[in-house]
Structure formats: structure tokens, C-alpha cells
Amino acid sequence: MEGISIAKLLIIGALIVLLFGTNKLRSLGGDLGSAIKGFKKAMKDEDTSAARTTAEETPAERVSHKD
């Protein structure tokens, strides 16, 4: 089995450009980039809020039982 060669990748790329056009591909790339940025920002915000919550928690009081 040969796999995908450079020539096949170029043909597939040319077909995609012909089907969608360069403007559509640019807008899709921009949308994908902003979605990834938003995801990274949300993950970063979640990490900082989780760290803040952990730091703000106070230890529980010990309960002593009388026998």
C-alpha cells in the first residue's frame, strides 16, 4: 500500500480551491482560528477560576466526639 503522495495532495488541494474558492477558504480559516482562540481563552479562564476557588476555600473544622 502506497499511501498519499505529494501529487495526490496537490490534486485534492486544487479541487478544494475550485469547489469553495479562495474567499470562502480564507473565511473558514479565520473562523477556525477565532474558535480555537476562544477555546483556549475559556480553558485558561476556567483554570484561573478553579485555582482561585481552591485558594479561597477554608479548611473544615474538626469535630471531636465525646465517649
UniProtKB/Swiss-Prot annotation:
Keywords recorded for this protein, A-Z = Cell inner membrane, Cell membrane, Membrane, Protein transport, Translocation, Transmembrane, Transmembrane helix, Transport
**Its GO CC terms?**
TAT protein transport complex
GO biological-process terms attached to the record:
protein transport by the Tat complex
Please name every pair of cysteines joined by a disulfide bond in this record: none
Membrane-crossing ranges are 1-21
Compartments, record wording: Cell inner membrane
**Which InterPro entries does the protein's record reference?**
TatA/B/E, TatA/E, TatE
The record's GO molecular-function terms, alphabetically, read:
protein transmembrane transporter activity
Spell out the Pfam families in the cross-references: TatA_B_E
Topology with respect to the bilayer: Single-pass membrane protein
Q: Which domain of life is it from?
A: Bacteria
In this chain, the stretch annotated as Disordered covers 44-67
Homology family: Belongs to the TatA/E family. TatE subfamily.
Q: Which HAMAP family match?
A: TatA_E, TatE
Function of the molecule: Part of the twin-arginine translocation (Tat) system that transports large folded proteins containing a characteristic twin-arginine motif in their signal peptide across membranes. TatE shares overlapping functions with TatA.
- Protein's recorded name: Probable Sec-independent protein translocase protein TatE
- Biological source species: Pantoea ananatis (strain LMG 20103)
Q: Which gene encodes it?
A: tatE
